[in-house]
From Swiss-Prot:
GO molecular-function term, one example from the UniProt record: nucleotide binding
Post-translational modification as stated in the protein's UniProt record: Phosphorylated by host PRKCA.
Subunit structure as annotated in this protein's UniProt entry: Influenza RNA polymerase is composed of three subunits: PB1, PB2 and PA. Interacts (via N-terminus) with PA (via C-terminus). Interacts (via C-terminus) with PB2 (via N-terminus); this interaction is essential for transcription initiation. Interacts (via C-terminus) with human PKP2 (via N-terminus); the interaction competitively inhibits the interaction between the RNA polymerase subunits PB1 and PB2.
Function: RNA-dependent RNA polymerase which is responsible for replication and transcription of virus RNA segments. The transcription of viral mRNAs occurs by a unique mechanism called cap-snatching. 5' methylated caps of cellular mRNAs are cleaved after 10-13 nucleotides by PA. In turn, these short capped RNAs are used as primers by PB1 for transcription of viral mRNAs. During virus replication, PB1 initiates RNA synthesis and copy vRNA into complementary RNA (cRNA) which in turn serves as a template for the production of more vRNAs.
Protein name, entry field: RNA-directed RNA polymerase catalytic subunit
């Protein structure tokens, strides 16, 4: 039957239909090829916004640097990065005055974190620029390589396992005259394959020592590698994002810890909270403005958009902020926190892979690496690329571009939020000393501004003053993209507010469907997503029931597990029909074994195995959940697993789902082809790390331990823990004397081996 789509909306208030206009169904666009062009765009734009600043040369690396701070006051409307130090410091002072003790308290909290954080904090995170190999690696591998190189160069403070000591090594390394590193290279040779008698290319991995002088090492330590941001919806053009190396990461982490601590105490900050908590926080600010705008005042809200937030921020400004925030703190703490902004003021952007050329007539392709862009003849490039390269050439050193102004995407989200909130804080009547006043919300580069005044002229004056104040702090509110409404209707971080937040359900659309982990996890995640959306996103019962039916259908097609009594023929139907016929209680079969679906919107919280357990034949139960069955996954299955859910917007969310270990919880094996590449050593390293970490977790189940503070290695911590546990178990009679003696003997042997090593 044909449904007239307008009928769907007859009962729906217009603002609730906002979701239907979002570009969130279907696959998001991905980037292909090189990100070099996007990176050059970023570098060139950033310099253009600060072009009237002062040029200097870095004495260590020889890199030309542009400093726009305290530069000429900006022209109206043009985005610019000329932040004025005294204005930023004054905004900080007023922020502190409105929140007495906020900086002091946050510093104390951060100091505690700094002293307790272990170096393994840096293994979190995805791709990281590995300066030893000059390319991206998984974070854990990049950290291991860095520590290995440090050790072979006589830097061993990091062996304490504390992050702060690793950072001491980083500081030391920058003073060394040279650093020796091990690099990998590939040898290719043509050999005849014994089986097929064809010629094949064999790759072998060689390692060689390489010495980096101080200048080359500094350039690498200050390098941010760049990639193209994938899966951005609603944009025509791609853009570049940066991934910093291990030298920078630790320092950034501490700065962000301090800024996060401050943001938690600011009612206008949309970070670090999320979800319903964030909505509640924001609703409070709106409520305050609406209740305070008495009958004599009118209230308007700007849904704000800033032009090129990152490219106009400046690390030197962040340094000024940190210097102010930590002004009464111990010297060592101030030094640790000021290093990140100093490194960012001297950062280099790696231009990525370079360009690929192909000649149609000669059928050959050749790669022009970024290192060659400084010297290659420009006649091979089209006009726009030629302009980019000409512009960037004065900034190039060894395939990286000097990029002093600007902050690449996502590096100092918390600290830049503090800067934004400090302007919102200036809107109180006692600061504006006029009839208008403002407040608002800030989350990284996104903001909403609420202005109250007796009349429209006052509103206009307030907005103008806000706009100009922003300019003085290097923030450029876009007049084209921001829009103003009566307070009560606005959008902030993709939350739509209309006398309360409306659910923007389309944002969640990408997370519906079959995840593709395995039959067990997929069923569990699928129903959990539906359940969560009923709780958080206004997914009504009828729609949820429909979503569930669609999900089951999708699931059956994905895993070819149509019901045993269906006519649909697939590769699995023969086995499934056989099982169906043999089974006495057919309702007990899992959907993935051709059983019926027993889910409805009332029982989504129950794992399928539990839901059907009482209905199952006994021998089916035995096969399904028997730990001796080789197909039941033997990895310790936590009762709760985490799935990473990608909403259409914002960061990936961690979602918990219940996991029951059955024959369906298999884990696919790694692709073989990786084992023949240079990545193989890395894989082995990763597995070794994994094993060590798993072992450590066994000794210290997360419920029972506070991280070992103080200086002990993982092995020492585990041995001492084993001894304590053994003694307790022996004294309470849980283990026999022989077992106790054996454990003690093993512990002593381990310590002995460590001493000999």
């Amino acid at each position: 039957m044909d449904v007239n789509p307008t009928l769907l909306f007859l009962k729906v208030p217009a603002q609730n239909a906002i979701s239907t206009t979002f570009p969130y169904t279907g696959d998001p666009p991905y980037s292909h090829g090189t990100g070099t062009g996007y990176t050059m765009d970023t570098v060139n734009r950033t310099h253009q916004y600060s072009e009237r600043g002062r040029w200097t040369t870095n004495t260590e690396t020889g890199a030309p640097q542009l400093n726009p701070i305290d530069g000429p006051l900006p022209e109206d409307n043009e985005p610019s990065g000329y932040a004025q130090t005294d204005c930023v410091l004054e905004a900080m002072a007023f922020l502190e005055e409105s929140h007495p003790g906020i900086f002091e308290t946050s510093c104390l909290e951060t100091m505690e974190v700094v002293q307790q954080t272990r170096v393994d904090k840096l293994t979190q995170g995805r791709q990281t620029y590995d300066w030893t190999l000059n390319r991206n690696q998984p974070a854990a591998t990049a950290l291991a390589n860095t520590i290995e190189v440090f050790r072979s160069n006589g830097l061993t403070a990091n062996e304490s396992g504390r992050l702060i000591d690793f950072l001491k090594d980083v500081m030391e390394s920058m003073n060394k005259e040279e650093m020796e590193i091990t690099t990998h290279f590939q040898r290719k040779r043509r050999v005849r394959d014994n089986m097929t008698k064809k010629m094949v290319t064999q790759r072998t991995i060689g390692k060689r020592k390489q010495r980096l002088n101080k200048r080359s090492y500094l350039i690498r330590a200050l390098t941010l590698n760049t990639m193209t941001k994938d899966a951005e919806r609603g944009k025509l053009k791609r853009r570049a994002i940066a991934t910093p190396g291990m030298q920078i990461r630790g320092f950034v982490y501490f700065v962000e810890t301090l800024a996060r601590s401050i943001c938690e105490k600011l009612e206008q900050s949309g970070l670090p909270v999320g979800g319903n908590e964030k909505k509640a926080k924001l609703a409070n600010v709106v409520r305050k403005m609406m209740t305070n705008s008495q009958d004599t005042e009118i209230s308007f809200t700007i849904t704000g958009d800033n032009t090129k937030w990152n490219e106009n921020q400046n690390p030197r400004m962040f340094l000024a902020m940190i210097t102010y925030i930590t002004r009464n703190q111990p010297e060592w703490f101030r030094n640790v926190l000021s290093i990140a902004p100093i490194m960012f003021s001297n950062k280099m952007a790696r231009l990525g892979k370079g360009y690929m050329f192909e000649s149609k007539s000669m059928k050959i392709r050749t790669q022009i690496p970024a290192e060659m862009l400084a010297s290659i003849d420009l006649k091979y490039f089209n006009d726009s690329t030629r302009k980019k390269i000409e512009k960037i050439r004065p900034l190039l050193i060894d395939g990286t571009a000097s990029l002093s102004p600007g902050m690449m995407m996502g590096m100092f989200n918390m600290l830049s939020t503090v800067l934004g909130v400090s302007i919102l804080n200036l809107g109180q009547k006692r600061h504006t000393k006029t009839t208008y006043w403002w407040d608002g919300l800030q989350s990284s580069d996104d903001f909403a501004l609420i202005v109250n005044a007796p009349n429209h002229e006052g509103i206009q004056a307030g907005v103008n003053r806000f706009y100009r104040t922003c300019k003085l702090l290097g923030i450029n509110m876009s007049k084209k993209k921001s829009y103003i409404n009566r307070t009560g209707t606005f959008e902030f971080t993709s939350f739509f507010y209309r006398y309360g937040f409306v659910a923007n359900f389309s944002m969640e659309l990408p997370s519906f469907g079959v995840s593709g982990i395995n039959e067990s996890a997929d069923m569990s995640i699928g129903v959990t997503v539906i359940k969560n959306n009923m709780i958080n996103n206004d997914l009504g019962p009828a729609t949820a029931q429909m979503a569930l039916q669609l999900f089951i259908k999708d699931y059956r097609y994905t895993y070819r597990c149509h019901r045993g009594d269906t006519q649909i023929q697939t590769r699995r139907s023969f086995e499934i029909k056989k099982l169906w016929e043999q089974t006495h209680s057919k309702a007990g079969l899992l959907v993935s074994d051709g059983g019926p679906n027993l889910y409805n919107i009332r029982n989504l919280h129950i794992p399928e195995v539990c839901l059907k357990w009482e209905l199952m034949d006994e021998d089916y139960q035995g096969r399904l959940c028997n730990p001796l069955n080789p197909f039941v996954n033997h990895k310790d299955i936590e009762s709760v697993n985490n799935a990473v859910i990608m909403p259409a917007h914002g960061p990936a969310k961690n979602m918990e789902y219940d996991a029951v270990a059955t024959t369906h919880s298999w884990i696919p094996k790694r692709n073989r082809s990786i084992l023949n590449t240079s990545q193989r050593g890395i894989l082995e390293d990763e597995q070794m790390y994994q094993k060590c970490c798993n072992l450590f977790e066994k000794f210290f189940p997360s419920s029972s331990y506070r991280r070992p503070v103080g200086i002990s290695s993982m092995v020492e911590a585990m041995v001492s823990r084993a001894r304590i546990d053994a003694r307790i178990d022996f004294e309470s009679g849980r283990i026999k004397k022989e077992e106790f003696t054996e454990i003690m003997k093993i512990c002593s042997t381990i310590e002995e081996l460590r001493r000999q090593k």
